[in-house]
């Protein structure tokens, strides 16, 4: 009986040592993983559009809310800032007359909580905790007095992604920035598609 008791104690000690070793090893492996930094914004990655206008005017009419679920006031750069950078790089006036006006009416970034399942199986799952959403609403107006030409493009672009409950603060920052960049790409796609419909707006 004493022999069986000692054997059981040895087995318990061995299992405990294995558990501690695995935990320490996992911690070492985790700490060695490189940290992903939030992606930067490089407007040079977008192809320029040669606009038949003498100047580009950017009007920021978006008043960012300072309360949840809006978080843009805590970001640098802001969503509005990215739009201005994009426009300054992409919409290049090369004409001798006329004007291109970009009126930004919304450039928001929000984070909202997602409902979680409370069943037993969900306790062992990495549930999605929050949703990041970036939204852009703007109007692009072209006024060319020569030939009495003009055109308007309505921009309505958005992007979103979810963040799991196990995400680190850095993971959260990466998700927010990537969502913002996705919205800029959506906006860029819309502008390129719609400028083709306005004859004479874009020069070769």
Question: Residues of each region from the PLM?
Answer:
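Sec-dependent bacterial lipoprotein signal peptides
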Residues: 1-28
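C-terminal/domain-edge helix-coil "capping" segments
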Residues: 167-204
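N-terminal segment of the mature soluble domain
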Residues: 50-113
